[in-house]
Amino acid sequence: MAMNYSDKVMEHFTNPQNVGEIENASGCGTVGNAVCGDIMSHMPVTNDAWDEGQGAYDYSPIFAQAAPYLQAADYAVANLETTLSETGPYSGYPAFKSPAALAGDLAEAGFDLLLTANNHCLDRGWDGLVSTLDALDGAGLAHVGTCRSAEERAENTIHVADVGGISVAFLGYTYGTNGIPVPQGREYAVSLFNTDYMTTLSTPDTGRLEEDLAAARALDTDLIAVMIHWGVEYQTTQNSYQEELADLLISNGADLVLGGHSHVPQPIEQRTVAGWDGTERTGFVCYSLGNFISSQVDPLTDTTAVLTVELTRDNAAGEASVTGWDYVPMLMVRRDGTERVFTLTDASSIPAGADSALAARLEEAAANCREILGEPRTGG
């Protein structure tokens, strides 16, 4: 039987294997774009990923409970906030370097595209940036935000993806690089949205953003999505700078603004502004989903969600839009002394056999997601 998208969302949150093709009598096609937060491999997480039996790193058990939701979506994106390398020694905060095996495990879990522009992208210098992109290429993962050459920047500043039949142009930016300068002569390496990325971090490069978005509009995709590393760490509300920047992006053509960096969830909303062409434009903004994986221990840095954004294309009108969203609350559960310490745990329901302490933590995570992210909107 045909399923409307709102029904599909709820079905794939409970039984992803049973989700079929979407049909809609009105001539509209609707698909789901999954969005996750910051992928961080602090050393406790890296150590936990080591599998003695395999003699190799394997992150997949850590986020196995999120994988069905990623795989049920038509496309899945996140922010990769570490560098990757085939060789150690590995490190966590403040200069991240993680096993390249993470890339393959993320691809196997269901991710399609990763933002690589963030404040940790130069933690291991130019070589680390290159080895990260090499690892992602080897795993078959698309990426936006950093580049190995001027030619790559010219070709890949905008990544066009087929999201279940809806074309989406993805762009990626970061506010800065933790005071590490972009290598001289390689200004193409990192997509920065601030002109003062080494100092005050307060002056957006409006010319660059407007130029990039004009180029994205010229591709005539159904939608444009901007993945952006911004905001203030550990704040559960957006600030006025984020709102102003979101408005600038939406005004110039962005339909989705997908943020990260705060390490805790921040709200989801729709914003309406005057567009570059004088028309009224409405854009979807997720300011942050917090950490997808990490070993930060605050209850809110452990709290995240797998967000699915509903994208609908009216085939008769030839237009696409965001028509709703839903999410599954997740909690990073740490069990010291066990074979697997870290488990990103589905907090949408209490699993059978959960003790009272775990049940309380999962209920708190779900409540925090509702309070911070807001209520889902589907089928609209």
Label every PLM stretch briefly:
Residues 1-18, 214:
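Extreme N-terminal tail/first-helix region
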Residues 2, 25, 136-138:
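Short, highly charged low-complexity linear segments
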Residues 4-5, 26-29, 144, 292-294:
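Short secondary-structure boundary micro-motifs
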Residues 7, 23-25, 72, 281:
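A short, polar/charged loop/turn motif at coil->beta-strand junctions and beta-hairpin connectors
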Residues 11, 15-37:
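Structured beta-strand/loop patches that form or line metal/cofactor-binding pockets in enzymes
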Residues 39-380:
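Acidic, metal/ion-coordinating pockets
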